[in-house]
């Protein structure tokens, strides 16, 4: 069984802009249909296929619901697979990364929960701006380099957001 396009699994056209509530509802509907428990009395082959379909559906949902992963996937659909790790040749972005990490370290050192909350809001705004920028250029072949650069920035902000959530948990303890 080949892997169908993640978008096709959900009866969607490839697009960066998705209705996440609609995606979640469709996921729940499909998950019920392919859940391995529904095939408990079936033969071994059917059980294995149900497991594969369920795993494929779960992977597709995780990719489509996360903007940076959806961006990477869309770019891969339109061209060569992107390497997971790439040396970033963007000095402004590298400087921004260093500044954000330094700011987060200071917030951690100061155990500044209010500062962390403000930092998190700024990150969310930056992520929304990147999402808008990516949505405007991902399907334009003449702007592929820009789309790849934006996708890498999205991935960085995702990692940083994860670190912020971890810091919040540590400071809440």
Swiss-Prot record:
The keyword Repeat does not apply. NCBIfam families: hscB, PRK00294.1. GO terms for cellular component: iron-sulfur cluster transfer complex. This is Co-chaperone protein HscB homolog. The keyword Repeat does not apply. It holds the Pfam family DnaJ. Belongs to the HscB family. It comes from the Bacteria.
